Amino acid sequence: GSSDMKWDQNYALTSDEKGNAYLYGNFVTNSRVDVKYGEAPLATHKFSQATVNAKSYALDATVVSLTDEGITYDQIVEDVKKELDAGKTYINIILAPDVDEETLEAIHIGLLEGEAKDWSINLTLIGCKKIPSRGFLHFDMLKSIVLPDVTEIGENAFSDCPGLQKVVLGNLTKVYGKGRENGIFDGCETRFIDLVLSKDQKVMNDGEAEGRYCWTADIITDYDLSNEHVSKKFLGYEFKSITCRYKFE
């Protein structure tokens, strides 16, 4: 049974309780369908040939939920490994808002035990608002990371992820750490990273909070079209491109 059906004059989209989306309709060659959570892409399907009448196309937008209070470290490792065993390189996970280091470590171990190749995994983590310090340290397998709900990030969060090519973040209010002194992207080649920020992102001002170096969102000034945006700079780093309403590259 479908939990949600959207009608258009050309197609119908239904979904089941496991997060699979089924598409019925007429699409021309090379047309594309994206399944998204807010701005975060969960699945993309490109039609290499025109669609066949009365045939449905399954779009795998499966999301793994790791929010159960009783979930163990080993269960998380196994759940992540299962995704890799199924041949997936796009992995979508729902987490609790205040995800802890242990959960992220279990995800890391699952990716390692599942033999994820370096620079191959596109990881989307839905629901988590705070990323702890060193949360994704040495996640060598990451090609992209999407954190649509995140508002606060701890020091060295993405340090030493040499293969990162794309980072999508939520509307940030606080980011800890100074570039080249435990900044969140230390050990990454940010000039090769496409950064996507929330359209509501404010300019980040550096200072201190609780004795730690901290970037705090400005109350008034929008980031989009700011001097930093135009010069592709954010949190003291320079990026390949920065998208915030508009893309500068």
Regions found by a protein language model. Give the residues of each.
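The feature captures the LRR N-terminal capping module
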Residues: 64-87, 101-105
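Short Pro-Gly-centered beta-turn/loop motif in secreted/extracellular proteins
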Residues: 20-32
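Conserved LRR concave beta-strand detector
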Residues: 122, 144, 152-155, 166, ...
